[in-house]
Structures are given as structure tokens and as C-alpha cells.
Amino acid sequence: MCDWIVYVIENKGYTYVGVSPDPVRRLRQHNGEICGGAKYTTSKGPGWKHVCLIGGFDDKIQSMQLEWAIKHVPPRSAGGLMNRLRKMVTALSRDRWTSKAPLAESVPLHIEWHQQHDFGEYVLPDHVTETFIQEAALRPSV
């Protein structure tokens, strides 16, 4: 059984939300180090970094439901990292991420922050916990 992760990445003011069982490998794909990155991210060039990883899903479908919900919080045209993070908190605070998703409170999630953020005061639902990772600990050993 593999754990599916929803991730938020950022590069030069652009953001992207995706799902992967291996977000480190997926980030390498987005940065063009190995093949398979999304067209959107490869067109923006290398330099993508994880902002946060969200885990705790029971299966791939649940992670994809949250990914969809984050991408569809209105207004969809509002870009930038701060707006993306606000949309993420909004999606996490819903009773259900989609009409067919389980009750959000039945899926205990954990956010692992990889970048400092300052998008104002926010309140996560009780079923969501968070930790902050030191940047030095993020670098993969060679």
C-alpha cells in the first residue's frame, strides 16, 4: 500500500498543486531533471520547490478529491502563492472536498510545511495537523 500525497510547489511566483506517492521524484520531474513533468511546470523552467505536502489519505482517490477541490476554490483566476494557500485552507475546511468525498473530518490529515509562509491568520480544522520542516533537513543526501 502506498501513501498518496497532495503537494503544493512554487517557482518564480507560479504555483502548482499535484498528487503523487513520491513527491521528491515528482518534483525532479517538474524541474526537468527526469522525464515526466507536467507541461505547465516544465514550461516555467527549473526552480520548483515544495511549499507543503499533505498526507494521511486512505487512498489515491481521496488525495485526488482534495487536489481537485484546491484547484477549484473560486476565484479560479486568482494566482500566486498566497492565494493558493488560502484556497488550500478553504478546501481543507469544507465538510467534503467533493460531493462524493468522505466527510473531511473522517480523514485525519497532516501538512508538512517546507517553506515559510505569511498569508495571514488561518485556522485549520481539528482533523488537520501541521509541522514545519527546517530547510537543511529538506535537502536529499547525495
For each of these PLM feature ranges, what is it?
Residues M1-C2, M64-E67, K71-V142:
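Boundary/linker segments flanking structured domains
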Residues W4, W48-K49:
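Glycine-rich phosphate/pyrophosphate-binding loop shared by adenosine-nucleotide-utilizing enzymes
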Residues W4-Y40, G56-V73:
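GIY-YIG-like beta-to-alpha core
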Residues Y40-G47:
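Short, flexible turn/loop "capping" segments at secondary-structure junctions
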Residues K49-G56:
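Solvent-exposed beta-strand motifs enriched in subsets of small alpha/beta binding domains
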